[in-house]
Amino acid sequence: MVKLRLKRIGKKKAAFYRIVATDARVKRDGEYIELIGTYNPINGYVKINYDLAYKWLLTGAQPTDTVRNLLSKEGLMNKLHNEKYVAKTTKSTKEKAATDKKAKVTKKPKTKTTTDVKK
């Protein structure tokens, strides 16, 4: 499973982090697949490559709590939510409308048949 998480690269008492996409089984400061951005907690500066972060989130990467908060502050999680989940609800309403139309079309009116009987 791929995770978006922080990798510490700062020196002692001067933390600095990289936001990376990495395998969940790798150590905190181990190898990573791709560099997404940086975070400096001392002055609160966040730099994120939105295209890469969005790509990884769409492919199913799970952000850690801290990374999710950083992405939310930058507005990326809201964009992802709107595209991923709102699109599903509009699809389901369109599908529901299409099935209702099919149901109306398949119902044929019953006609009475009369037979002429000669006496």
Curated annotation (Swiss-Prot):
GO molecular function, one term: structural constituent of ribosome
Top-rank lineage group of the source organism: Bacteria
GO cellular component: cytoplasm; small ribosomal subunit
Gene Ontology terms: biological process: translation
Skewed-composition ranges (Basic and acidic residues): 89-103
Keywords, comma-separated and alphabetical: Ribonucleoprotein, Ribosomal protein
Region (Disordered): 89-119
The keyword Ribosomal protein appears for this protein: yes
UniProt-listed Pfam families: Ribosomal_S16
InterPro entries given in the database record: Ribosomal_bS16, Ribosomal_bS16_CS, Ribosomal_bS16_dom_sf
Family membership noted in the UniProt record: Belongs to the bacterial ribosomal protein bS16 family.
HAMAP family per UniProt: Ribosomal_bS16 (MF_00385)
Protein name: Small ribosomal subunit protein bS16
Origin species: Spiroplasma kunkelii
Gene coding for it: rpsP
